[in-house]
Amino acid sequence: MNLSLENKVIIVSGGARGIGEGIVKTLLAEKAIPVVIDQRVSSIEGVKTIQADLTNPQACATAIENIAKEFGSIDGLVNNAGVNDGVNLANGNYQSFIDSLHKNLVHYYLLAHHALPYLKTSKGAIVNISSKTAETGQGGTSAYAAANGGRNALTREWAVELLQFGIRVNAVVVAECYTPMYQEWIQTQENPEEKLQSIQANIPLGKRFTTPEEIGQTVSFLLSEKSSHTTGQLIHVDGGYVHLDRAL
């Protein structure tokens, strides 16, 4: 694709591995300048990483400030960092629920809040990565599901609030995307290979997992002017997992 993203400075939270790394790779292929905010350092040569604990509000502010100082502009923000941490209704508690919201939702707001002055100047775009758990439920993950519901709601709210500045806001909703974190979860199952096969069998298109790069390609499109009249959308990149008949 030629999405005219060359030299555009795009922040990717949680960009050091998994879906975030897939997004970074596709942005690099488009000659953009992805900047990762993560506790880990990106293993991709030449990619700038700002190491930060995104559950710390001041760290969010400082990360944006440092990126703006170093690069001079911010052309896009991809809110991606988070973890399905299994805080459920039966065994969770107040603190674990609140902590999960900080890991999965609050920094979406804070990064966008601090990046907003720069995005107004560049008329940039925001893409929020979300999860099917907000729509389908999963069981055993109340806080993560709530956080993703919040991500979807913020996408629509920001799309309205930022219309006046020409800033577009969309979400990419992920279902079954095979990443290192997903592999770690599979290994906790009683029969990992059997569980993996059963999940794949329920993905309508191709009976396979979505790849991080496929998520990245849609994200790159939404960041680009090729999607200049698209805002407030929750776009499912999931092989039909959420909306198509599982009997297919």
Descriptions of predicted regions:
Residues 88-101, 199-200:
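Substrate-binding pocket helix/loop in short-chain dehydrogenase/reductase
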Residues 112, 147, 155:
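Active-site helix of classical SDR
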